[in-house]
C-alpha cells in the first residue's frame, strides 16, 4: 500500500464526499437520487464555500445563491468567478423571509443551515414557499450522535449563536420537513471522516493551526489508506451509519 501524497490528502474530502454519494457527475446528481438538469432553477440557501453551487452550474442549471454571511457569499462568488454559466443572483439574507417570489425554484439545496436559525419552522416554510409544485429538496443538518459526542470537548461557542442553536434528532428533523408540507423520499447519513476530524480538532485546543495538523493529518492518512482497501467501502458505510457528521433528507413538494 502506497502512502498518501499531499495531493491525495488535499483531495480526500472530495473523495470521501463522492463515496458518500455526492457530486455524481456522470449521473448529473448533486447527491445520489437528486438530479440537477440543464435549465433547472436551483436555490442554494446557505451556499457556504460554493461547492454545491459549482456542481449545479456545471450541470447547466440556473442558480441563485444566498447566505447570511457576507464572507461565505464572497467565497462562493470567487469560486465560480469566470464560470461560463454564472449564478443568476447572490443574496445576502437571513432568509426571514427570503426575498424571492413564491414558487420559482425547481430544486432547493440547504445544507447545514437549519441548526443555526432561530425559528426552524418559519425557515423551512420559506423554503417550501419558494419551491414550485413538484420541487425537489436536499436538506442536511448535523447528526445528533456526533453533536452529543462533541458536547464535552467543543468550544462553548460551538453551541451558541451564530453557530449550532439546537441538536435535531432524526425523528424531529423528518417531522420538521413533513409538517412543512413536503414528502420525504429518501434519508441518508454520511461524514464519519469529518466526525473524527472534529473530535481531533477539539483535542488540539485553541492554538490552530499549529496544534491541529499533528492530530488531523495522521487521521487523514489513515482514512485515505482505509478507503483504498478491499473492505474500504463497507467500512465507510458502517462508520457513516454509526457516527455520521450529517443526516440528509431528500424531499418533494406536492403537485
Task: Tell where the protein language model's regions lie, with residue ranges.
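A short hydrophobic/small-residue beta-strand
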Residues: 63, 137-138
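A short glycine-rich, Lys/Arg-flanked "PGG" loop and its adjoining helix->strand segment in the class I
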Residues: 121-136
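Conserved S-adenosyl-L-methionine
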Residues: 182-193
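C-terminal helical/coil "lid" or tail adjacent to the Rossmann-like core of SAM-dependent
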Residues: 194-229
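Alpha/beta-hydrolase-fold catalytic nucleophile elbow
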Residues: 140-142, 190
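Residues lining the SAM
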Residues: 111-114, 140
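Conserved N-terminal segment of class I S-adenosyl-L-methionine
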Residues: 1-101, 107-111, 121-124, 188-190, ...
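Short, glycine-/aromatic-enriched active-site segment of Class I SAM-dependent methyltransferases
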Residues: 142-166, 175
Amino acid at each position: 500500500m502506497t502512502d498518501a501524497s499531499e495531493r491525495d490528502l488535499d483531495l480526500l474530502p472530495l473523495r470521501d464526499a463522492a463515496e458518500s454519494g455526492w457530486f455524481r457527475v456522470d449521473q448529473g446528481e448533486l447527491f445520489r437520487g437528486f438530479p440537477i438538469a440543464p435549465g433547472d432553477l436551483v436555490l442554494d440557501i446557505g451556499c457556504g464555500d460554493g461547492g454545491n453551487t459549482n456542481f449545479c452550474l456545471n450541470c447547466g442549471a440556473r442558480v441563485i445563491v444566498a447566505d447570511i454571511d457576507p464572507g461565505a457569499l464572497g467565497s462562493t462568488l470567487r469560486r465560480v468567478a469566470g464560470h461560463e454559466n454564472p449564478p443568476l443572483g447572490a443574496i445576502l439574507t437571513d432568509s426571514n423571509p427570503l426575498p424571492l417570489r413564491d414558487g420559482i425554484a425547481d430544486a432547493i439545496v440547504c445544507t447545514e443551515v437549519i441548526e443555526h436559525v432561530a425559528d426552524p419552522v418559519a425557515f423551512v416554510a420559506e423554503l417550501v414557499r419558494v419551491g414550485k409544485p413538484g420541487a425537489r429538496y436536499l436538506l442536511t443538518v448535523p447528526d445528533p450522535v456526533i453533536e452529543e459526542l462533541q458536547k464535552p470537548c467543543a468550544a462553548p461557542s460551538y453551541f451558541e449563536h451564530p453557530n449550532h442553536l439546537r441538536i435535531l434528532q432524526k425523528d424531529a428533523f423528518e417531522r420538521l420537513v413533513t409538517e412543512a408540507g413536503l414528502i420525504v423520499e429518501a434519508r441518508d447519513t454520511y461524514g464519519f471522516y469529518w466526525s473524527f476530524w472534529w473530535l481531533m480538532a477539539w483535542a488540539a485546543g485553541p492554538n490552530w493551526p499549529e496544534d491541529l495538523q499533528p492530530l488531523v493529518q495522521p487521521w487523514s492518512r489513515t482514512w485515505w489508506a482505509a478507503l483504498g482497501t478491499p473492505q474500504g467501502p463497507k467500512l465507510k458505510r458502517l462508520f457513516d451509519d454509526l457516527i455520521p457528521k450529517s443526516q440528509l433528507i431528500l424531499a418533494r413538494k406536492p403537485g
